[in-house]
Amino acid sequence: MNQTMKLTFVNVGYGEAMILECPDPRYRGGNFVMVIDGGSAEPGEFEDSVSGRLPFSEYLRTYGPDHIDLMICTHIHEDHLCGLLPAAELNTPSAFWQTLSSDFYASMPPLDGRPVKTASQDKFLRALRDYRSLCHSLAAHGTVLRTLRAGEIISLCEGLTCRVLAPAALRTDELQRDLRSLLDEQADDAFIEKLTALDARMNNYSLMLMLEYQ
């Protein structure tokens, strides 16, 4: 059991993956464990072992922690989201926070076989597929899916408070509208155009959190 809050930034290469552990006797092992993003799932991202980078799930398997109370996806990009899928298969989180409506994934098609022309388009399409797969898997295992909105203040554990700074409801509605337009598009050229445009804007819809620990 940790005696104070511990924040770990895992070397997953270009993307992001963070683990926050906070002492609280109400949780397993006396620690509340929160994961924010999971880095990439591309094997090529980890070929350079000299840098010390490794897949997020491998880090969890080797160094722990042995459970996840809360998993957060800041936005749907390959180098932030796709590493969460194997991490969740290793340790299913009790709760999952993200920006889309908690049931949006259920209406998403598989997206298998949709066309791409560039590596960037392929990465974004895989991120969308993995988001869908992740949410389906989490829901099937009883994880509580929650949508965050700017202005919320949430107590996470003893002494730790989370303030949601972004996105605003207007931004989330815009994201869902544009994503629905993309998913419903049948013409290949128009699909690729919408895919590229949404990929370029996705960072604008990211979760922004301020954590306060006392």
Language model: regions and residue ranges:
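Soluble catalytic regions of membrane-associated enzymes that act on cell-envelope
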Residues: 64, 74, 95
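Conserved beta-strand hairpin/beta-sheet module of binuclear metal-dependent hydrolase folds
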Residues: 2-66, 202-214
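Short acidic, S/G/P-rich loop/turn micro-motifs used as interaction or catalytic elements
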Residues: 40-43, 78, 171
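Metallo-beta-lactamase
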Residues: 68-79
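Flexible, acidic/histidine-containing loops and adjacent segments that form or flank the divalent-metal
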Residues: 2-5, 81-214
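Short, well-ordered alpha-helical microsegments
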Residues: 17, 80-81
